[in-house]
Amino acid sequence: MKILDWSQLDGAAQTDALTRPVQTVAARTRDAVAALIADVRTRGDAALREITAHFDGVSLDSFAVSEAEFAAAEAAVPPELRQAMQDAVARIDTFHRAGMSGGYAVETAPGVVCEKIVRPIGRVGLYVPAGSAPLPSTALMLGVPARLAGCREVVLCTPPRKDGSVDPAVLVAARLTGVRRVFKLGGAQAIAAMAYGTESLPSCDKLFGPGNSYVTEAKQQVAQSGAAAIDMPAGPSEVLVIADAGAQPAFVAADLLSQAEHGPDSQVLLLSDSDALIGAVRAQLEVQLAQLSRADIARQALAQSRLIKVQTLDEAFAISNRYAPEHLILALREPRGWLAQVEAAGSVFLGDYTPEALGDYCSGTNHVLPTSGAARAYSGVSVASFQNMVSVQAASKAGIDGIGACALVLARAEGLDAHANAVALRMGVAA
């Protein structure tokens, strides 16, 4: 990893230091995804079979996972893994249940009541990537809030393996959260199928889940077309660590590597006011890399990442807020005291004993988070992500008589005569 001194960089160099590996979508990626989506919309399952054979190397007669396959998955998953997933589900449920809203009602004027009522989204589609490794934890993170929200139907897509099966742990994770319909589909084609529907898959109202640049681009394209809403831009993973001189170099290095091993397009950043800490972390990276099975992938990610020396921790937080990381680790002596300075981050991890990996798996928070700077305006997945808040209002005759004059003045100011007339008729006055 490159070591940079922030104070020695001009504006352009600072911008370059914070640029993600996948900051923009290449035109060819955009065009390829658009063509794939159009093919799925036109030819349905036939297109899915051809695309799956080409990209996943397997020919499928049926995309739906059968009951026999679910049973085989249950038998294949080791008891300790199943128990770990059950424990994670319990904590994810506890955290997400605590944040649920039941709506509210308020009388805004005598005889005028305004409400918010909560309704589940009817049918949702969950995407669980497999890429270089299956991610059953993502099935847990999406399935639990979908269940709590009360969605009528939940569909899950995950890429098939070369033998036409799906990773058993993903199937068990799906069942643990109540998901019954799982399809062997990956990539942009899965997004297209869930958005528009095919002979095998129903069209969904909203799509959830992370993925590579093709999946992220597909989600954005189907959302722009109005076919399905999406949770957020959720692309390659990233972490930013702010560490002081008292941080443990081995811990910091381990946190950086835990994100770097996700893929070559991941990005990890360290900001510290301590030259000694930066040097020690750099040395620890080499020590720990030698022990990793995915060292080659991690090295590719580290080649595009930075160790940045700052003058003060205040400067570090200013940089972090500008970057708006998916994951932000505060390896500081008084981490909670600095929390007030965090303005934009998907999820924050406080102190030396809160590795980002806990949030990935089992602390209870959700690991489906905004990336690529989207944390400035988006939040991570929650139960509310799977619900609609519907506005309701009711006015009595006394109510409209009391506030109608306000509506008349505003309607006339906007030149909307029919609006004014709809109020005036009920009030028994001239529009």
UniProtKB/Swiss-Prot annotation:
Q: Mind telling me which PROSITE patterns this protein's record contains? A: HISOL_DEHYDROGENASE
- Which pathway does it take part in? Amino-acid biosynthesis; L-histidine biosynthesis; L-histidine from 5-phospho-alpha-D-ribose 1-diphosphate: step 9/9
GO BP term, pick one: L-histidine biosynthetic process
The GO terms this record gives for MF are: histidinol dehydrogenase activity; NAD binding; zinc ion binding
| EC number(s) on file | 1.1.1.23
Q: What CDD domains does the database record attribute to this sequence?
A: Histidinol_dh
- At the top of the EC hierarchy, this enzyme's class is oxidoreductase
For this UniProt record, the keywords arranged alphabetically read as follows:
Amino-acid biosynthesis, Histidine biosynthesis, Metal-binding, NAD, Oxidoreductase, Zinc
Instruction: Report the co-factor binding details.
Output: Binds 1 zinc ion per subunit.
- Known cofactor(s): Zn(2+)
Q: Which residues bind Zn(2+)?
A: 259, 262, 360, 419
Which transformation does this protein catalyse, written as a reaction? L-histidinol + 2 NAD(+) + H2O = L-histidine + 2 NADH + 3 H(+)
The residues the record assigns to binding substrate are 237, 259, 262, 327, 360, 414, 419
Q: Which Pfam family would be a valid example here?
A: Histidinol_dh
Could you name the Gene Ontology cellular component terms for this entry?
cytosol
* Residues the record marks as active site: 326 (proton acceptor), 327 (proton acceptor)
Binding positions (NAD(+)): 127, 189, 212
Q: What does this protein do?
A: Catalyzes the sequential NAD-dependent oxidations of L-histidinol to L-histidinaldehyde and then to L-histidine.
The record's family statement is:
Belongs to the histidinol dehydrogenase family.
Record-given protein name: Histidinol dehydrogenase
Origin organism of this chain?
Answer: Xanthomonas axonopodis pv. citri (strain 306)
Q: Which gene encodes it?
A: hisD
